[in-house]
Swiss-Prot record:
Record keyword S-adenosyl-L-methionine present: yes
UniProt catalytic activity: cytidine(1402) in 16S rRNA + S-adenosyl-L-methionine = N(4)-methylcytidine(1402) in 16S rRNA + S-adenosyl-L-homocysteine + H(+)
Role: Specifically methylates the N4 position of cytidine in position 1402 (C1402) of 16S rRNA.
Broad class of the protein's primary localization: cytoplasm
Similarity remark: Belongs to the methyltransferase superfamily. RsmH family.
Subcellular localization: Cytoplasm
GO biological process: rRNA base methylation
Keyword S-adenosyl-L-methionine: yes
HAMAP family referenced in this protein's UniProt entry, alphabetically: 16SrRNA_methyltr_H (MF_01007)
Protein name according to UniProt: Ribosomal RNA small subunit methyltransferase H
Binding, S-adenosyl-L-methionine: G30, G31, H32, D49, F74, D96, Q103
GO cellular component terms attached to this protein's record: cytoplasm
Amino acid sequence: MHYSVLLQESINDLNINPQGIYIDATFGRGGHSKAILNRLTTGRLIAFDKDLDAISYARENFQFSNFEIVHASFASIYDYCLQHSLLGKIDGIIMDLGVSSPQLDNAARGFSFTHNGPLDMRMDVSKGITASQALEELSVDDLSYIFKVYGEERFAKKIALRIKDYIQQNGSIRTTLELAELIRATIGKKEKKNPATRCFQALRIYVNNELKDLEALLENILAVIKSGGRIAAISFHSLEDRIVKQKFSALINPKQELNRITKMLPQDSSQIKLKWITKKSKANEDELNQNVRSRSAILRVVEKL
């Protein structure tokens, strides 16, 4: 069963205009898309996803005249809007970041460290290198950097050395459980969390260019959204949330140079581009009981001035 996390909160905060144009940056299995479509009359929705399974699902189950699915990363939303004369015309954007439940639950996709499958991890299986190939191609230093920065893994160097040594002896790491067991054997089980959690996250982020895609989307998002339009972002780990929070905060409270004489900040309201609608919201107890994966979700919503 796929649950869209913080569904009602995010859709309510978008304040849907029934005649508006909306973007679902991460279609997944269409939970947020369906909720938006239910509130539209003459409005329309454009959804994006890199995952071919998600695209197929949308084409089979979302055959609505006011809905379009685009097989692309959300990093291309600006280019899409530019090509379709939609810059500054979007009423709202929802982004549900990270890996989806169907991706995690399908062992063949290679995201899970508890179910065995090929070590793939690509959200778009039509292009790019697999996680297995990445482990072979990356140096110890690069792999260590990825584990440390993208996974916040304390034992990054130790794990990277063990992986490269294993590959040198065995040729490659082909399956998810092969990698998970190697990590566990390297650092042991020192906490409740599976010891492979952080490295799998880091490798997935690297393979799918997730943080760079997010930065690319946020860099141009003001040009896409109309005045009064809203942006809702749901993140599941601190790296994503930090990027979202910093970008939103920079446009709400822009840093300005201190006046040397008055020692005061100039009141230049033209630099303020957004306002908070929801600074930080988390799943309530009912949702946590229904879907344990919602425990780390953070919703932030802003409105363009």
